[in-house]
UniProtKB/Swiss-Prot annotation:
It is found in: Cytoplasm. The keyword Protein biosynthesis applies. Component of the 30S ribosomal translation pre-initiation complex which assembles on the 30S ribosome in the order IF-2 and IF-3, IF-1 and N-formylmethionyl-tRNA(fMet); mRNA recruitment can occur at any time during PIC assembly. One of its GO terms (molecular function) is rRNA binding. It comes from the Bacteria. Its main location: cytoplasm. The gene is infA. SUPFAM superfamilies: Nucleic acid-binding proteins (SSF50249). GO terms for cellular component: cytosol. The keyword Protein biosynthesis applies. This is Translation initiation factor IF-1. Keywords: Cytoplasm, Initiation factor, Protein biosynthesis, RNA-binding, rRNA-binding. Pfam families: eIF-1a.
């Protein structure tokens, strides 16, 4: 799958779950399950409840996503 196939949304982290998973509410009021991207893990970027984030999702499963950016 290429980068062009991914869909990007902006949302807010609502809840921290085990195994580095997060419940994120998107701006369009949908709630998804998301995990942090590899570069965010490598650079030890912390994501807390209430943070605004960018989420990438595939068109095949719109209930899961990957957090790629945390806004300041």
């Amino acid at each position: 799958m290429s980068k062009e196939d991914l869909i990007e949304f902006t949302g807010t982290v609502m809840e921290l779950l085990p195994n580095a998973m997060f419940r994120v509410t998107l701006d369009n009021e949908h709630t998804i399950l998301a995990h942090t991207s590899g570069k965010m893990r490598k650079n030890r970027i912390r994501v807390l409840a209430g943070d605004r984030v960018n989420v990438e999702m595939t068109p095949y499963d719109l209930s899961k996503g990957r957090i790629t950016f945390r806004f300041k």
